[in-house]
């Protein structure tokens, strides 16, 4: 579902069994991963503007528990969780996160705003999740206010309209009889 809904941690077989049971309430497939301790969660966003890709500074969301929960993210102070922005991490690490975010955007051919979530563990950066429709459009990673973000949205919308008009002249279908079955008329076989 996203937003950490359905996420549980387990430290033994009993809690693992309970976590699996809880997870199946939300989906019919689960991912079970080794639990990491003492990691730092990082977020970085990107969008295509008129002058190329714009990559945000790196954010560190602050969790009140071992994992960043839905409550931490959306029900915290002032309607959102606590955060460190920009994240107090080594400059080299922040630049690497920003570069990976830019590469993800380019390689997947994204449109609009994305936010990429990372885990920093023992000095290594792990890509955790790509949010193609990030909560609040991740405006807080580009602007201090929603009013300031309106210029960014206007730019994204105008660029999207331009891109769409270039796609609208392309053909998205090709008519062919290659899949027609010989001898079939109106769904009934012909008698010879």
Please state what every model-predicted region is.
Residues 1-9, 19:
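Phosphate/diphosphate-binding glycine-rich loops and adjacent basic-rich segments that engage nucleotide
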Residues 11-84, 88-92, 120, 124-125:
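Phosphate-binding site of ATP-dependent enzymes
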Residues 5-6, 84, 109:
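Short, flexible active-site loop motifs that bind/organize anionic cofactors or intermediates
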Residues 2-3, 82-83, 136-140:
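Short small-residue beta-strand/loop micro-motif enriched in glycine and branched aliphatics
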Residues 1, 75, 133-135:
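Short connector loops/turns at beta-strand edges and beta->alpha or beta->beta junctions
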